Amino acid sequence: MKNTAIKLSGILLAGAVFFSTLLGYGTQVAAATAIGSDTEEGQASGDGSVASVADLPGKHIGVQLGTTGDIMVSDYETDGSGTVVERYNKGADAVQALKQGKLDCVIIDELPALAFVEQNEGLKILEENFVEEDYAFVIAKGNEALVDQVNETLRELKDEGVLDNIAKNYTGTDEEIGKYPYEILDVERTNGTLTVGTNAEFPPYEYYEEGKITGIDMDIMQAVCDKLGMELKIEDMAFDSVIP
């Protein structure tokens, strides 16, 4: 399994924020962080600004349906603070609502949030510890043989430095990004097809580029298939439908 260290952090957009996650491989635990506003930082809560986790109650919060952010803020809806949570099928839709002034903040994984920051002026990530959590690839119960195969293959890829290179290609230094693309191996693929379900709306984990789904997770799965002699089939679906 792939364990991903998660870090929720605040992203600012005219008084609104994102929670986000930090990628890591191994057995790291996620550290969640808080949020803040560039233009209204330090203002008291109750005026629409978000400068810390303490400011979340009573705010209008956007999340992607079924994500960690969705789970995180659900308790705020029933604590009597008047918090309203808007759930979107795509993180990008929540971001647009934020830019249009319909939300006070958006809660989303860090690396996708960083991509939104790069694409949209006025966004800023503010860090504050909030929660810890593990992420992993998921295989259906009853398929222990595949679980063992994938786990062993991931260990081999880690030991060989392949996982580190894949991560550096997307999230490394300016000198590293784009310099370590995973190259599909020319191997016999006689062991069937590995079908991977994902929501391709989370750059750099998984996203569309020139009509093809790519990203860290997809490169890892391609490397796994190369090792196992399998074809890779990627199915893009709503995040909330990946695990029914």
Which residues does each predicted region cover?
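Ligand-binding clefts/hinges and TM-proximal coupling segments of bilobed small-molecule sensing domains
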Residues: 31-34, 68-85, 121, 125-129, ...
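Periplasmic-binding protein-like
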Residues: 36, 41-42, 110, 114-151, ...
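Bilobed "Venus flytrap"/periplasmic-binding protein-like clamshell domains
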Residues: 40-91, 110-114, 196-203, 213-228
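Sec-dependent signal peptide cleavage junction
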Residues: 21-38
